[in-house]
Design a protein with these regions (language model features):
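Extended hydrophobic packing segments that form well-structured cores
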Residues: 23-130
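Glycine-rich, Lys/Arg-enriched anion-binding loops that position phosphate/diphosphate groups
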Residues: 1-36
Length: 130
C-alpha cells in the first residue's frame, strides 16, 4: 500500500526471499513460448503458510509457466491461490479446487453498475432496474 486511502495503507511483513525470477507473458494460452516483461520476487511470510509473488509488471498470471518463472513449481499444491486480475483464465479455472471472482474497484472495474457513465442510452442494464 502507498497510503492513498484507508484501503491502501502500508504494512510491514517479515519475509524470506524464496526466488528471484521473471515476469513472462505467454505468446498464446498454454504456450511454452513467452516474452519476458519484467522481474519478480517470491517471498514467504515468516511464521505463516503464505507465499507472495511481487512483480514490477502488471501481467495477468494465466497458468503454470508464469508461476514456474516466479519460482512456484506447482501452484496447484497450494490450498489457496489469489490472483488480482479481472478474469479467471482457463488453466487456473481447470486447476483450482475452488475459485471466486471478486469485483473490486480499480482501473478496470468489473462491477459495471459502479462505473460513472456520462452518456447512457436508457434503459441500460445494470444501470437501470430492468
Amino acid at each position: 500500500g502507498v497510503g492513498v486511502n484507508e484501503l491502501n495503507e502500508p504494512v510491514s511483513l517479515d519475509v524470506t526471499i524464496l526466488h528471484k525470477g521473471e515476469v513472462v507473458n505467454p505468446i498464446a494460452v498454454k504456450s511454452s513460448m513467452y516474452k519476458v516483461c519484467g522481474k519478480c520476487v517470491t517471498v514467504h511470510v515468516d511464521n505463516t503458510n503464505i507465499d507472495i509473488i511481487v512483480s514490477n509488471d502488471h501481467k495477468s498470471y494465466q497458468g503454470q509457466l508464469q508461476f514456474e518463472k516466479a519460482g512456484i513449481q506447482n501452484w496447484k499444491e497450494y490450498d489457496c491461490v489469489v490472483v488480482k486480475q479481472g478474469y479467471i483464465f482457463p488453466e487456473l479455472k481447470e486447476g483450482a479446487k475452488f475459485y471466486v471472482m471478486s469485483l473490486t474497484d480499480g482501473p478496470t472495474p468489473q462491477n459495471t453498475a459502479k462505473i460513472p457513465f456520462k452518456l447512457v442510452m436508457r434503459p441500460m442494464y445494470p444501470i437501470d432496474n430492468i
